[in-house]
Amino acid sequence: MELKTCCIILPLLCTLTSYAEALDHAAILKSPNELQLECSKYLPSIDVSQNVDCYDRCIGLVGRFWNDSIGRPAQTIARYYQPDTGSQDHITRTDQCLCEKVLTVPRNAYCQRASSGLQCYLDNYGQLLTGTPQFVPVTEIRAAQIFWDCAQMLQISRDRLTQIFKDGYNKTSEGRCLIRCFLVRAGLYSDRQGPNIGRFAVQCEGYTAEYEQAVVSCYDRLKKESLDSCSLATRTMDECIQGNQFSSSDIDGLEKLEVQ
């Protein structure tokens, strides 16, 4: 199987700005109720001019499980549901519904496709966990903020930060510690427990049992090498996450740094 490209987005340094985060790191967790409340503040329930309800599309965008270019809910939407215990065909039923009620809708009818997609999950996948916060994937903008935040904490100048990414972040101890800081601050990794597989699965859309086992086996192998904390974190990202052949990610891959 072809190796998937990296799902952690490294920022364009020319767009980095300083950013103040809460003390509990920068991970964002939101429940369906919170997604709905947030969208209710952004837009009315009905676009009067076009008579189209874009509320569900907004929920998908804020929860990072909807992308107009794909036109159907990402696999990550499943984290908001408890599958039906009495049936094992909830995935099949949901996929069938998506084929019949989403893929038949014109590609540019984004709001209609989003609403139909969410309805398929509500009707077929299981119980919506309305009050349970779930991890929201890191976007490119947030990644840039977190990296610059880490650079400030590690006393890495902007010029040096640019050089680290230009030369390769895994080439120096500074670069490796920068990656460790990013992973910890993004809520994807800890020195005590290693990679948070559930959150990485959301970030990289790797949901199979093979994906999880590959991460566990890879991390266990690296721990036996008695690496320092920064090297362990960086190699975990490089070898266990971004080199994971079982990731089904349709998220933008790791982007090579372009310094202007």
Swiss-Prot record:
It holds the Pfam family PBP_GOBP. Disulfide bonds join 177-230. Residues 1-22 form the signal peptide. GO terms for molecular function: odorant binding. GO terms for biological process: sensory perception of smell. One of its GO terms (cellular component) is extracellular space. Gene3D superfamilies: Pheromone/general odorant binding protein domain. Keywords: Disulfide bond, Olfaction, Secreted, Sensory transduction, Signal, Transport. Coiled coil: none annotated. Expressed in the ovary at 48 and 72 hours post blood meal (PBM) but not at 12 hours PBM (at protein level). Expressed only in females with high levels in ovaries and lower levels in the fat body. Not detected in the midgut. Not detected in the head at 48 hours PBM. SUPFAM superfamilies: Insect pheromone/odorant-binding proteins. It comes from the Eukaryota. Induction: By blood feed. Accumulates highly at 48 hours post blood meal. It is found in: Secreted. Belongs to the PBP/GOBP family. Present in the aqueous fluid surrounding olfactory sensory dendrites and thought to aid in the capture and transport of hydrophobic odorants into and through this fluid. PANTHER family: GENERAL ODORANT-BINDING PROTEIN 99A-RELATED, ODORANT BINDING PROTEIN-RELATED. This is General odorant-binding protein 45. It comes from Aedes aegypti (Yellowfever mosquito).
